[in-house]
Amino acid sequence: MKTALILLSILGMACAFSMKNLHRRVKIEDSEENGVFKYRPRYYLYKHAYFYPHLKRFPVQGSSDSSEENGDDSSEEEEEEEETSNEGENNEESNEDEDSEAENTTLSATTLGYGEDATPGTGYTGLAAIQLPKKAGDITNKATKEKESDEEEEEEEEGNENEESEAEVDENEQGINGTSTNSTEAENGNGSSGGDNGEEGEEESVTGANAEDTTETGRQGKGTSKTTTSPNGGFEPTTPPQVYRTTSPPFGKTTTVEYEGEYEYTGANEYDNGYEIYESENGEPRGDNYRAYEDEYSYFKGQGYDGYDGQNYYHHQ
């Protein structure tokens, strides 16, 4: 019994002494000086970048607080419940207002191009992953309606293009005779109908004038590049206007010699001697050009940093 008590007392003293040293070391390490000069990371894993920030975000750690883990799980469950409730609400609203839903679903993230069918599984991803694929028959009906509306729009556009082309042909036939397109439109009533606006008539007249110029130039000889103007005023090739206080150089000549006085010449014309003279006559500072710099500092090329005048600096202190 005595030996057992003695051993227990010795063991308790050793444990108390070791714990005392541990607490003392922790307090010393928490000081500001040791935090700056003696940085020893408390946890070995924090030395590595891929373990930092704190490990409570990762499920690998087994010693994290159970309350935090339970909190994360509960938050995930709440999010799932919210998603399911949103899905239920969307289903109810879809049953009540089908027309409004049809308008909203067409505003999807990826709009369909012309001629593409909306499949019931992949079409209408307007509310990403929340909206469920439902009522394939309604979706196909919507797709057929869209097709019909697109075909009607195309037919209207083709009809308008045909009318414009016919009007341009009539204007070209009358413009070749020398009469102006505006007068023919006013007299004969071609071009713009009674229901069209005045702006459309003006645009058609401009296109007709351009067509007149092209037809007249095509009738002339192919060797001549000169354009003749139409009797109604046409277009003449003009040279671009000169900028104020500038003189254009003659054709085929450069501006380096004759027009040198107009520009400020900032190059090194006086001191540019091809980097061949070490000490120039013009008082150029040493080291200003590369050749002089290389000649001046090539003395130190073969020597190490510790060699001065053939002596080792650290061995002669």
From Swiss-Prot:
InterPro entries (UniProt xref): IBSP (IPR008412)
Phosphoserine sites (modified residues): 31, 67, 74-75, 94, 100, 149, 280
Chain ranges for the short sequence motif Integrin-binding motif as given in the UniProt record: 286-288
Localization (cell): Secreted
Single GO cellular component term: vesicle
Protein's name in the database: Integrin-binding sialoprotein
PANTHER family referenced in this protein's UniProt entry, alphabetically: BONE SIALOPROTEIN 2
Organism listed in the record: Homo sapiens (Human)
PTM statement from Swiss-Prot or TrEMBL: N-glycosylated; glycans consist of sialylated and core-fucosylated bi-, tri- and tetraantennary chains. O-glycosylated at eight sites; mucin-type glycans contain Gal, GlcNAc, GalNAc and terminal NeuAc.
Modified residues (Sulfotyrosine): 313-314
Top-level taxon of origin: Eukaryota
Protein transport listed as a keyword: no
Signal peptide positions on this chain: 1-16
Ranges annotated as biased composition (Polar residues): 222-232
Function: Binds tightly to hydroxyapatite. Appears to form an integral part of the mineralized matrix. Probably important to cell-matrix interaction. Promotes adhesion and migration of various cells via the alpha-V/beta-3 integrin receptor (ITGAV:ITGB3).
Tissue and organ distribution: Expressed in bone (at protein level). Expressed in trophoblast cells of placenta (at protein level). Expressed in brain.
Gene Ontology annotations of biological process type: bone mineralization; cell adhesion; cellular response to growth factor stimulus; extracellular matrix organization; osteoblast differentiation; positive regulation of cell adhesion
Subunit annotation: Monomer. Interacts with integrins; the interaction promotes cell adhesion.
Annotated spans, Disordered: 58-254
Biased composition (Acidic residues): 66-102, 149-173
